[in-house]
Structures are given as structure tokens and as C-alpha cells.
Amino acid sequence: MWDLEYCKDLDLQHNLDVMHIEKNICDSIVGTLLNIEGKRKDILKSRIDLTHLGIRKDLQVQDEGKPRDMAPAVYVLDKVKRKEFCKVLSRVRFPHGFASNPERRVSADGNKVQGLKTHDCHVLLQRVLPIILRGLGRPKLYRAVAELGQFFKELYSRNIRIDALERLRDKIPTILCDLEKIYPPAFFDVMVHLAVHLPDEALLRGPVQYGWMYPIERRLGTFKGYVRNRARPEGSIAEAYIAT
């Protein structure tokens, strides 16, 4: 990309997808909170990292430690709290067309949340997750996640002022610092740090509705529904598109 002649003249050199950044951050928070295999960030290696870095002594584990030696953390719920979290989530009801039914995302054993789509994470992070965390008695975590959800909520505004974007640009580093006081370093992958650049991109591009992937994903979903011969998906899509 950097070899292209016009690249140096572009003001907006990257068009970061707000939709997937928000989803990945939400997946990391929920996966760690409910201790979901494959999505959690609180694993044995992350605790050993704390020992090597000499920080967060209350959560440190020695090199020869085992997962059962990991001390309880505020960002991970125990089994009783996980069931309570899923129970509350399954009882949430939204106006028709606002969001999908959260009950469908709760596993049969009522112990974890699975199959979250991008819009599910959008609603969960901005509106539902802070309320549940406050009810579960996690005030420090609640404040940090609520600030993060409010950041995305303001960023998603249809009409947004330049001074509001400048305020969000100054606010997001503080929000991430608050999260760093709670979560281990392993939580902060590239997707979490990309949130810092979103207000700057909105200042250059305009409202995020002109740069997110929702319409593209919906259109791709329509095309996938055209597939009848999975051995030749492109031909199936082309024939169905011409027929319509």
C-alpha cells in the first residue's frame, strides 16, 4: 500500500471498521467475564506475564503454577455470578426490530453467551453490559466499561459536532488507562488500541455510518442466500442475481 504514488497524499490512509473493532472489544470483555474458552484473556500465561513484569502482585502466578492457582480477579465472574449474568441477559427485551433476542445467545446450561453477532455486541456494550455489571457489584469494572460504551455511543451519532469528536479523542486514552488498571496486559490486543484512532478518522471522514461494514455485511448475507451449489458458489450467486 505504501508503494502507491497517491498514498502520501491521502488524508484518510486507513478506513478502520468501527463495527468490527467494537465487536472484538466486546467479545474480549464478555469472553473474559464469563471465562469462555478461546475468547478469554485471563489465562495462565497472562498471569505469569504479571510476575515477569512485577505488577499486580495480587494476581501473579509463578512459572510452575497451574490454572487452579490463579487468584480470583474482578474482571472474571465465578460460576454463580455467570449464571446470574446469563439469567439477566436472557430476560432483556427490546422493541421489535431494535435487536435480536438475547435469550437465543445464552447457552443451554445458562453458563455462557455464544454466537454474538456484530449488532448484538453493539447493543450489549453500549446499553446492556454496564447495567448488568453494576447489578453484579463490580463498581470499578462497571465505570470503565460504561465509559467505553458511552464512547462508542457518542461516536455512532448520526449528527456529531467537531468539538464532540475532539472531546472523544481526548477522552479515549483515559478510558483505556482505566481499563489497564483492571485488565492484564494480555487483554490489550491491536483491536483495543485501534479505538484511539477512531475519533481522528471520524474528523476526516465524517460520521461512522459512511465507513462501517453493516451495509456490506447485509449485502453479502443476501448473496450467500443465493448459493445453491456449494461447489460453485460464484456461479450460483451470478445466476440468482441475474434472475432477480
Description of each model-found segment:
Residues 1-244:
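A structural signal for the principal folded core domain
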